[in-house]
């Protein structure tokens, strides 16, 4: 078994006091493309754990007519909207890829909105603990999502596995997948930020076998947190 398989990392995540008032334990779930974040999220959800998905929130905060989309329009111009008034994601994606400073400006608008929406969902959670899933939980430090978490769980996989899964799932070319991976931390760097790392190289049964003891640990930690807060 790999030393990274469902064991605490010696470089444990040490966040500041979580920036939310909930007594609920928040586990940040992250990992590179094709590492199995969705499979892990689905398993936790099946155990009755509330899942906050940063990708879903990122889409929700820029829906047609939203305050965040209006801010983006004022900042960049009407071209960010398509003929239906929705955000033209392809145009915006091309623009920020061409002009890196534009990405910084865009994230200065979207990240606070994503963070606030995540905090609202945390406040509404009723499960013993919450999983906050974010592909760039560590990379996008300025978004502040990692500081909402008391613990970080990293899904880990070799590059070959990532490429195989992502190409099968998303029908992406190897070149496109590698371009995405360039903007993500390396496995080694990401694992340094983790409290727990699951090496996801086999089938779902093997993955679930690693997640079960972590789930039990998180239930215990959640109880401890609530007792300490009372």
Curated annotation (Swiss-Prot):
Its EC number is 2.7.1.24. One of its GO terms (biological process) is coenzyme A biosynthetic process. Keywords: ATP-binding, Coenzyme A biosynthesis, Cytoplasm, Kinase, Nucleotide-binding, Transferase. It is an enzyme of class 2 (transferase). One of its GO terms (cellular component) is cytoplasm. ATP binds at residues 34-39. The keyword ATP-binding applies. HAMAP family: Dephospho_CoA_kinase. NCBIfam families: dephospho-CoA kinase. This is Dephospho-CoA kinase. The gene is coaE.
């Amino acid at each position: 078994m790999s030393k990274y398989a469902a064991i605490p990392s010696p470089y444990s995540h040490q966040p500041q006091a979580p920036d939310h008032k909930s007594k609920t334990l928040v586990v940040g779930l992250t990992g590179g493309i094709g590492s199995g974040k969705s499979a892990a999220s689905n398993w936790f959800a099946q155990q009755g754990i509330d899942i906050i998905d940063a990708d879903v929130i990122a889409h929700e905060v820029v829906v047609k007519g939203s305050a965040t989309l209006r801010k983006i329009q004022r900042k960049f111009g009407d071209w960010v909207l398509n003929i239906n008034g929705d955000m033209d994601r392809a145009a915006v994606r091309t623009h920020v890829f061409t002009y890196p400073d534009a990405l910084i400006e865009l994230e200065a608008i979207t990240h606070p909105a994503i963070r606030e929406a995540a905090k609202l969902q945390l406040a509404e959670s009723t499960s013993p603990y919450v999983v906050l899933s974010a592909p760039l939980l560590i990379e996008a430090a300025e978004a502040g999502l990692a500081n909402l978490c008391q613990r970080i769980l990293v899904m880990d996989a070799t590059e070959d596995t990532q490429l195989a899964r992502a190409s099968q799932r998303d029908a992406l070319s190897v070149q496109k997948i590698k371009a995405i991976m360039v903007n993500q931390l390396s496995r080694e760097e990401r694992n340094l930020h983790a409290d727990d790392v699951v090496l996801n190289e086999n089938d779902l049964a093997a993955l679930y076998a690693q997640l079960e003891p972590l789930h039990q640990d998180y239930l215990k930690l959640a109880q401890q947190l609530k007792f300490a807060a009372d």
